[in-house]
Regions:
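Transmembrane alpha-helical segments of multipass membrane enzymes and assembly factors
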Residues: 98-112, 149-150
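Membrane-interface alpha helices of multi-pass inner-membrane proteins
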Residues: 123-124, 143, 153-177
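Perimembrane helix-loop-helix junctions
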Residues: 172-196
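Transmembrane and membrane-interface helices of multi-pass
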Residues: 91, 110-123
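Membrane-embedded alpha-helical segments of multi-pass membrane proteins
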Residues: 88-96, 134-142, 165-172
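TM-lumen/periplasm interface segments of multi-pass membrane proteins
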Residues: 2-105, 124
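Specific aromatic-rich, kink-prone transmembrane helix
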Residues: 100, 135-152
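Short acidic/glycine- and proline-prone juxtamembrane loop motifs at membrane-interface regions
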Residues: 127-135
């Protein structure tokens, strides 16, 4: 009989093989045309320089520049390997998220598999539809990890990455700022934290 750890690793591997064979709808219908504009260095740095050439019926890439730059290496790698860059980025960020969640909450890997890795809703929303919410979520969880370690500047940095990639995380910002201010021991530290 297979050890539980090996069984879960095989399940994870099979999921990744399955996802890498798919190309999400949003990637096909919206993201590809936006990323294909990146034909030279100048057009890659400013992806909106030729946006007037794209279909005007909807916003082609409804995310920030940060999300674009995060996905750009996955786009190039996906082109070389002939696989979906959205699913490739998901697999990368999922591995990072699993690692961070293990460190943050001292959770066994086997407990994360069925909640995160084998969750059909996550597989559908990312693998089939192509939603990119896992990237800012990973940044936010990394921020919480550094917050737990009382390393507030790294935490602030990853909160900024999270907010820059998806604005919805601004809802949690007041709670985290209050926690930062609670960690500070002097008024001078409070002022520096607030200004940072």
């Amino acid at each position: 009989m297979l050890d539980k750890k090996y069984f879960l690793t095989i399940l994870l591997f099979l999921k990744y093989l399955f996802l890498l064979r798919l190309t999400p709808d949003l990637e096909i219908n919206r993201y590809i045309s936006f990323f294909e504009q990146c034909s030279n260095f100048k057009s890659c740095i400013n992806p909106y320089s030729q946006i007037d050439l794209l279909d005007k019926t909807y916003l082609t890439f409804p995310y920030s520049n940060l999300m674009y730059f995060v996905l750009l290496p996955f786009y190039f790698l996906g082109n070389v390997l002939n696989i979906s860059f959205v699913n490739l980025s998901y697999l990368f960020f999922e591995v990072v998220l699993i690692y961070v969640l293990q460190k943050l909450f001292n959770v066994f890997l086997s407990n994360l598999y069925f909640i995160l890795v084998l969750n059909p809703l996550i597989i559908y929303s990312i693998g089939i539809l192509g939603q990119l919410d896992f990237i800012p979520l990973t940044f936010f969880m990394i921020s919480l990890y550094y917050l737990k370690d009382k390393n507030k500047y790294y935490s602030i940095f990853f909160i900024i990455l999270s907010l820059s990639s998806k604005i919805i995380f601004v809802i949690l910002l007041p709670i985290i700022v209050l926690y930062f201010l609670k960690l500070d021991e002097t008024l001078d530290e409070n002022i520096r934290t607030t200004l940072y």
